[in-house]
Amino acid sequence: MSSITSFINHNFGGIRRKDSAFAEQKITCSDCQNVELYYTELNSGVGLRTSKGNISVSTYHQDQELISLIPSDENIIGIFETVQLGVKRLILYTESETKGRLYNVILDSYTINLLVDDLNVTGEATGCDFTQGWLDMFIFSNGKDIKYIYSNSEAYKELIVESENNIKLIDTENRPVSGLGLVIFDSRLWIFDGKVLWYSQQGECRVFNYADPEVVTSSGYIEFVKDITAIYPYLGSLAVFHKDSSVLVQLDSQTGFKQDEESPGGCASHKALVFHGTDLYFYDDTKKGVFSFQQIINGDKTLGDNIALDIQKELMLIDSDDIDKIRALSVVTEDRNEVWFLCPISEEKEYSIVLIFDYLRGEWVKRKCQHINDIQIFDNELYSAGKELYKEYMSDTFDEEFIGAFYQCTVINMDSDNTLKITKMPPRLSVDGEYRNNFYVKYVKNYNTLKPPKIKEIKSKTKKGIIYYDKGYRYDSGYIYLPSVVTSVVRLPSSTFKALEITFFTEKLRQEFCIKTLEISKLKIKQV
């Protein structure tokens, strides 16, 4: 007994292990790398394409020699955007084996200015702006050293490092104030170290030792019974995180501040949280999940569901000694709405893995790149940093190194591993004509990973190779550029199987794909 069926899928998804699918409604993947989802604008579809890499913006050629702005013995630990009197400025924190440094970088002119030298080596970096209008202050800390930097001119002149004589980094008990997690809340600078959370005098981010019980603007500190891991302003209060729990510190007219009861959601480290959309997302290593604080109707918060169940396999690879290397970033640009988690899970130390939550489509994908330490938005553009400063989504390579892409589809078995499936017609892909669509497809049949898989190179027969490099120009009145809505159809190999795992991948330079639909026509299902 047999039957014939067919389907066409317009909707690709990300990594799904909890509710995976290979059906007409959606095709998900068990794993992927350097691919992204996009709206095809056809039939409410979501397509699949290889993602772009990055380029170094801290190097340039001079007399056929490659020159780097960053000294050869230093690595970039932190990237910061500070706005000084309306002017956006780029700050880099670097470390060598012996010292840390702060630089102001002007990308347009390949200029780098040393701001602070001989800082302690900690491998950490945090910073924030204290905006006052008449004097905007950028405050930096690496956990040991705290520096205040500002500009007194709207012109693009060198920044000024505040004199230590004007800074009172001792608290009301004469203890030194230092630590991480710098944030601004209630017009004060907040900073934590261990179980102590300090706050500056209101309106004065440089003073921590002014105390007067009759003055509500006084500086002070709050001591907790557990170590603090992160802090973040949320809903008119300050969210204070521990490893496995959190509390809200709220304003109080009588006592200045008061604490709510503990919530079960904790945060792994001071950069493992980010505000995106209307929610505060944070990675809890004790639960190996990404949770969020969500605002409910009455204005209170509630703990959201774990959105990272499908990538728990990757999160289990995070070593407890590397927790402080996690970086979370809200990425909202012209064509992106994502939450990035830079996680120390790569088995190869020369590479890094970014787990990306596609906020619009509610899907996870993975990005593999050269080793980086930080990610940041500067002037509405996405940057990363390691040995150099990189601008993302600008190239087919990662600073001239090719790193392959793949999309390993969820296994197709039509709800049964015991029936034989025969493709009477080759499966077909509709691909975007603006891409090269030169890639490989791999078939693994019946879960047999010991047998060599069937691999075939796919080459689209579009006209892109003819007129791609003419995009944006008109050489005569008859010239018409091939629009992105033009599609081409490529055929995949036919196959006979009980269960089939399909993988699309690239393995050499100038390979890429952009898939709109996958169609399987006349699939015969036979009882055996």
Indicate where each model-derived feature is located.
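Beta-propeller and closely related beta-sheet repeat lectin domains
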Residues: I77, C128-F130, L180, S187, ...
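Short beta-strand motif characteristic of blades in beta-propeller domains
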Residues: I91-T94, F138-F140, R188-D193, S237-H242, ...
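Beta-sheet repeat architectures centered on beta-propellers
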Residues: M1-W134, P264-D279, D284-V528
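Surface-exposed extracellular loop regions of Gram-negative outer-membrane beta-barrel proteins
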Residues: G100, L238-S263
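Carboxylate/His-rich catalytic cores and anion/metal-binding grooves
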Residues: V177, G181-V207
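Asp-box/WD-like beta-propeller blade repeats and closely related beta-sheet repeat scaffolds
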Residues: N152-G181
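Surface-exposed loop and turn segments in beta-propeller and other repeat-based domains
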Residues: L119-N120, S163-E173, A211-E223, G304-I323
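Surface-exposed loop/turn positions within WD40 beta-propeller blades
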Residues: S96-K99, G143-K144, S153, G194-K195, ...
